């Protein structure tokens, strides 16, 4: 496979060692973010991770989108995975030993069962198989629906959203802004069934963000993990498209408890 020269000037750390393992393209994303208390989020994190905060607040993000151009290095295309919708619930963390910032996913829903199985096996991520659809209403307007399969209690997300077009303020998120804090993350963290903390490197160019509007009719994702979202309008952004590179998951350290008391860190600036 031909190697691609990657832009790295925006990264706070060098690229991970070795070669990337997978590429994907993420399309028509809504970033919906709510402030949360650090303690409420921290109690759900695995040992070894701290809540990363912006101006004293933790943040929970719900991100619906659809992906395509999925390629695993050295592996034929995944059957039926040419493109499919995805939905995730995430927060922002640091490794308490190294300070490395990243994303921690509480849940990820996808409509392709084989892709769910591969992601669970290779990246230890909490993927769920879901009935999903995304319908384009206009150039930047979408209707999104997700209902998790094989669960006792329905976990449903239903929303309409639209991007409002690029602005100079959001043309490219800058360090120190909330937009940068929420989107410029280059590692994902998870814990496997043995309670071991794992991480994987991610690479992309800076997110091209737009302001957005959304009508969220139903959102059960946070309640499914025991968090009540505040009754307030979320911070909304839209992004048209971004190519993403993922490195293999690696073990950070063994023998961790899957849950512990909250640990919180506030970034400088």
Residue ranges and their predicted role:
Residues 55-58, 63-97:
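Long, hydrophobic/aromatic-enriched structural stretches that serve as scaffold segments
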Residues 29, 88-269:
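Internal, well-folded beta-alpha domain core
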Residues 1-73, 217-220, 227-267:
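Hydrophobic, proline/glycine-rich low-complexity stretches
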Residues 35-51, 84-102:
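N-terminal short leaders/motifs
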Residues 5-10, 78-90, 133-139:
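Short, surface-exposed, charge-dense and proline/glycine-enriched linear segments
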């Amino acid at each position: 496979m031909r190697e691609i020269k990657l832009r790295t000037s925006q990264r706070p750390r060098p690229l991970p060692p070795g070669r990337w393992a997978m590429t994907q393209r993420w399309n028509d994303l809504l970033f919906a973010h709510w402030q949360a208390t650090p303690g409420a989020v921290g109690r759900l994190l695995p040992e070894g991770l701290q809540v990363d905060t912006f101006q004293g607040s933790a943040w929970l993000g719900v991100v619906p989108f659809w992906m395509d151009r999925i390629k695993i290095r050295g592996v034929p295309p995944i059957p039926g995975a040419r493109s499919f919708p995805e939905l995730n619930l995430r927060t922002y963390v640091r490794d308490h030993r190294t300070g490395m910032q990243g994303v921690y996913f509480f849940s990820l829903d996808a409509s392709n069962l084989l892709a769910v199985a591969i992601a669970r096996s290779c990246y230890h991520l909490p993927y769920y198989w879901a009935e999903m659809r995304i319908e384009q209403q206009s150039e930047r307007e979408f209707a999104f629906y997700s209902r998790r399969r094989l669960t006792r209690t329905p976990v449903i997300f239903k929303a309409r959203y639209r991007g409002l077009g690029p602005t100079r303020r959001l043309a490219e998120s800058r360090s120190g802004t909330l937009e940068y804090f929420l989107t410029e993350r280059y590692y994902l963290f998870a814990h496997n069934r043995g309670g071991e903390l794992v991480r994987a490197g991610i690479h992309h160019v800076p997110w091209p963000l737009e302001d957005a509007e959304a009508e969220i009719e139903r959102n059960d994702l946070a309640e499914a993990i025991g968090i009540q979202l505040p009754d307030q309008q979320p911070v909304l952004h839209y992004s048209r498209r971004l190519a993403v590179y993922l490195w293999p998951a690696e073990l950070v350290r063994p023998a961790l408890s899957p849950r512990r008391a909250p640990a919180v860190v506030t970034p400088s600036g």
